[in-house]
Amino acid sequence: MKKIIIILVSILCLTGCGKKEYDNPIVTMNIKDYGTIKIELYPKYAPNTVANFVNLVEEGFYNGNTFHRLVPGFVLQGGDPEGNGTGGPGYSIKGEFRENGYTKNNLKHTTGIISMARSASPDSAGSQFFIVLADTQMISASLDNKYAAFGKVIQGMDVIKNIEDSAEVKDSQTGKLKENITIESATVDTFGKEYKVTKA
């Protein structure tokens, strides 16, 4: 009986130990002067948004890119090659959120969630994204079902908090930073999966 228990425990260990910690893509961003963050992407909720982000990371689009906007207690925004909120990758993708007719994305905009920035047009997102800095009713009312949330910071929220606390905002109305914060590098581990983006 003792031998049977040992064998069963060994089998459980083998099956459990062989399982990957993550199946979803994991993005690692190195932020100059601040540190490293890791973001888990959620293709279950926003597959094309995730595919777009993965493709941009793999192309090196975000290397040397910046965070250009900070509204403390609200969002930190980046991903614009122009560094001023007007740029993008030269194309856009369809917005995967409920108010745009996409019903599979029920992610809420809570602390650490990453979501796509866009203009007034629902299908205008390209490369700009924002990270949510707090859990409030105002944030929920402003963003939930209106923007395509697609991932979450799973490591390094202390880095993001440090940016929120120490970066100097030049214009409190727009959130424009006095000095943009550089994303030195961004890499992604897709665990062998391929992600193909459909452009709008």
What residue spans do the PLM features occupy?
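Positively charged n-region of N-terminal signal peptides that target proteins for export
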Residues: 1-4
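Cyclophilin-like peptidyl-prolyl cis-trans isomerases
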Residues: 8-200
